Amino acid sequence: MVPHITTSISDSPLDVAALIGAAGSPEAGGIGVFVGTVRATPAQPETDRAVVRLEYEAHPTLADETLRALAHDAATKWDLIRVIAIHRTGSCELGEPTVVIACSAPHRAAALEACRWLIDELKTSLPVWKKEIYSDGSSWI
């Protein structure tokens, strides 16, 4: 079976429900989902400043290629039916989704394992950079 893979680096707000729905399939026994959102606590716990929003920048071509390759690797390794992997760029407000990963498979274990692997790989290898914005300044993470 050839998996259906959808990836994107997007400067538009993410429609989480639509993206999860797109991962569904009559052959799927489960969909593993991860939704990353903007939180008020900073990445560095020693920082006592609250995050107001995040700003993401990406290397457009390389980020697209990397995300697609990671999604393909996950689909192959776990025999997935569908893979959705979308990452935001631009300014993102508190609570706003910044990344959506949805993997469907015949059985839940594969869907969940693939989803976990994909977000972990994305965090270490995707050329997307994050800046925390505070009320009194900013910091690249």
Give names to the regions the model predicted:
Residues I101:
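Phosphate/diphosphate ligand-binding glycine-rich loop within oxidoreductases
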Residues M1-T98, P106, A110-I141:
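N-terminal, polar/charged subdomain of small-to-medium soluble alpha/beta proteins
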